[in-house]
């Protein structure tokens, strides 16, 4: 009788349209219930039975119920699932398998089966890649996943590397392929094999892509030739190797090993500027005046060189600082090191006065055993030899940026626009409260940005610098020339690492077109999107492997009295994140560890401070002593506690 009743259908429709609904993201808790977060201010409680229909991170539409002044959300429609492709650990045996996603807030095992054609007998503890196939909000009875790839067995010592690479869908090994002979590019190569070129790298480096030669000129001028490995002499544009490099975009440097962009035969041998081996290069000859200015007679050319020495950062630094027992093997090499140090000094001063110089932060290096165990983590400060190479590379990249801009009008540029214009007024207001007066319009110009950065660098602490970081825009890769505010430069285009960066290979091809006087095609914008995405994934992979290794390294320190100096890097409502100064590990200090009385404690991300009873006790950039309270291996998180 009620079937097809238009009045009833209308009533149902009316009820449906009058029922309040909200769209948001599900946030799970460890206690079974959850919240629907609609925005920063508003969230709704999701009771445990309703949480069974959703997963942490799902974007959903929910019906909002009000009972006795308490609102709760009932999930109704899935907008975007949190999990699609994921990695996890397998539970159970062949006929009844489940997978627990490798995520701090996803604890439930999801029933699963192996995909057709996947020839692996999964067992308890195996790591796998899975894809979600069913979801309760899509009309399915329960969650269900399909195992699409076996990663490795549970006790594999190299789990951190293999799982991380699988998670981010990155290659595990070098690309296949060989380059048998050099291309005929119609380039005349200058023979510079008689000059005393040197490379300066880490002792373990095999893919040497830059060699340097310096010469004193009259009028207190210096000449610098930067010679760069020439992979585009072997790899034709559009070839199989070129396409593979284009996809990878960068060599992926992870703790303990790297996955090269090019086949190792090229990266570590044919293109590597090995000592006493003749190699083709793309080179830049520049003249530096007494104050370090790069003069206008910049010259790019093809050449052949023979590096006369593979020098090592620490040994060169020791020798220049008159320590250690290493000596250059000849007076000619010693003279090169002295001249390069002079160039470094001049360029450093020029950049300090006319551009911007980054504050030196140490690099942290993991020393690993044969089974991937962490033997030690050492901080490697940036010393004079590191700065020699850095200044030479920055100078060479400035030269390329100018030549490509003036001769072609395009290239692969690193662009950084400083502050987001939308944030300029808020930035000026914040600085004013700290006694720094800036013009909101001027700070958006390169000169205004540099002026502010120099004022911030002169501050006694880095606190104010850390406060304004959130107002900055991100660096981008662009085919259009543009300024790089972070470096304080009008234009910056890298070409000095073509073995490990595809964008540098593109710039090599463009520079070769300039050398030959040919027209060149502007790179497509899609390539910059691919490069930016790969850079993001590689950085995440490096961080993920690092987190795993830090957790392994500090596990035996949990619950002990071992003290670590730690710099506060971030403050949020829940506590503080700190970086251990000696090894670079990131740890979290929960708010209850800072002060037991929650109502007397204010942790403000906005101000970068922790206040107890109205007094500022901690602020971002403070260095404090901590002990390790706990290391949670399943989430690779380190919990620290301030030393009382």
From Swiss-Prot:
GO MF terms, alphabetically ordered: exoribonuclease II activity; RNA binding
GO biological process, one term: mRNA catabolic process
Subcellular locations according to the entry: Cytoplasm
Enzyme Commission number(s): 3.1.13.1
Catalytic activity: Exonucleolytic cleavage in the 3'- to 5'-direction to yield nucleoside 5'-phosphates
GO cellular component term of the entry, any: cytosol
Disulphide-bridged cysteine pairs: none
Database matches in Pfam families: OB_RNB, RNB, S1
Residue ranges constituting the S1 motif domain according to the UniProt record: 561-643
Highest taxon above the source species: Bacteria
SMART domains reported for this sequence: CSP, RNB
PROSITE patterns named in the record: RIBONUCLEASE_II
Domain RNB: 189-516
Keywords (A to Z) from UniProt: Cytoplasm, Exonuclease, Hydrolase, Nuclease, RNA-binding
Presence of keyword Mitochondrion: no
Main location: cytoplasm
Role according to the record: Involved in mRNA degradation. Hydrolyzes single-stranded polyribonucleotides processively in the 3' to 5' direction.
Family to which this protein belongs: Belongs to the RNR ribonuclease family. RNase II subfamily.
UniProt protein name: Exoribonuclease 2
Species name: Escherichia coli O8 (strain IAI1)
Source taxonomy: Bacteria, Pseudomonadati, Pseudomonadota, Gammaproteobacteria, Enterobacterales
């Amino acid at each position: 009788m009620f079937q097809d009743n238009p009045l009833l259908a209308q009533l149902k429709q009316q009820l449906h349209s009058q029922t309040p609904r909200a769209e948001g993201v599900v946030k799970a808790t460890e206690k079974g219930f959850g919240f629907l977060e609609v925005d920063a201010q508003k969230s709704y409680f999701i009771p445990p039975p309703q949480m069974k229909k959703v997963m942490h991170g799902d974007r959903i539409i929910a019906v909002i119920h009000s009972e006795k002044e308490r609102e709760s959300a009932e999930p109704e429609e899935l907008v975007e699932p949190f999990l699609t492709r994921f990695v996890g650990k397998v539970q159970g045996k062949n006929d009844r398998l489940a997978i627990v996603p490798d995520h701090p807030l996803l604890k439930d095992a999801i029933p699963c089966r192996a995909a057709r054609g996947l020839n692996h007998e999964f067992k308890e503890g195996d790591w796998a890649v899975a894809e979600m196939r069913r979801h309760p909000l899509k009309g399915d009875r329960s969650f269900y996943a399909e195992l699409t790839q076996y990663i490795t067995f549970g006790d594999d010592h190299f789990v951190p590397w293999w799982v991380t690479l699988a998670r981010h869908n990155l290659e595990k090994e070098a690309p296949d392929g060989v380059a048998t002979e050099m291309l005929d590019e119609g380039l005349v190569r200058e023979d510079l094999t008689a000059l005393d070129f040197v490379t300066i790298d880490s002792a373990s480096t095999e893919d040497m892509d830059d060699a340097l030669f310096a010469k004193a000129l009259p009028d207190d001028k210096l000449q610098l030739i930067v010679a760069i490995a020439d992979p585009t002499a072997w790899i034709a544009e559009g070839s199989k190797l070129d396409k593979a490099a284009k996809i990878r975009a960068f060599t992926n440097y992870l703790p303990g090993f790297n996955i090269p962009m090019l086949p190792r035969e090229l990266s570590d041998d044919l293109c590597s500027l090995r000592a006493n081996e003749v190699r083709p290069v793309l080179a830049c000859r520049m003249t530096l005046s007494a104050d370090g200015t790069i003069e206008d007679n910049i010259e790019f050319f093809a050449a052949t060189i023979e590096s006369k020495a593979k020098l090592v950062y620490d040994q060169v630094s020791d020798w220049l600082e008159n320590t250690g027992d290493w000596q250059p093997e000849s007076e000619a090499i010693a003279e090169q090191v002295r001249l390069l140090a002079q160039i470094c000094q001049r360029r450093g001063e020029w950049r300090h006065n006319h551009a911007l110089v980054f504050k030196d932060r140490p690099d942290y290096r993991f020393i690993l055993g044969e089974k991937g165990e962490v033997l030690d983590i050492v901080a490697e400060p940036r010393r004079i030899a590191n700065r020699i190479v850095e200044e030479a590379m920055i100078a060479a990249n400035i030269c390329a940026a100018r030549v490509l801009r003036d001769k072609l009008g395009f290239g692969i540029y690193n662009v950084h626009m400083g502050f987001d214009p939308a944030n300029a007024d808020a930035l000026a207001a914040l600085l004013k409260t700290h006694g720094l007066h800036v013009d909101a319009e001027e700070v958006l110009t390169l000169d205004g940005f540099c002026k502010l950065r120099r004022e911030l660098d002169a501050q006694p602490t880095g606190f104010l610098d850390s406060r304004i970081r959130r107002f900055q825009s991100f660096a981008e890769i662009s085919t259009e020339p543009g300024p790089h505010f972070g470096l304080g430069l009008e234009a910056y285009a890298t070409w000095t690492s073509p073995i490990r960066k595809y964008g540098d290979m593109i710039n090599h091809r463009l520079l070769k077109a300039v050398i030959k006087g040919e027209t060149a095609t502007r790179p497509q914008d899609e390539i910059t999107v691919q490069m930016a995405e790969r850079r993001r994934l590689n950085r995440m992979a490096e961080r993920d492997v690092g987190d795993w290794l830090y957790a392994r390294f500090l596990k035996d320190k949990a619950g002990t009295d071992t003290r670590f100096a730690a710099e506060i890097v971030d403050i949020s409502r829940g506590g503080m994140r700190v970086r251990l100064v000696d090894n670079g590990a990131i740890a979290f200090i929960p708010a209850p560890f800072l002060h037991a009385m929650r109502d007397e404690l204010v942790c403000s991300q906005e101000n970068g401070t922790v206040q107890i009873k109205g007094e500022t006790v901690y602020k971002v950039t403070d260095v404090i002593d901590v002990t390790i309270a706990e290391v949670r291996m399943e989430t690779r998180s380190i919990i620290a506690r301030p030393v009382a």
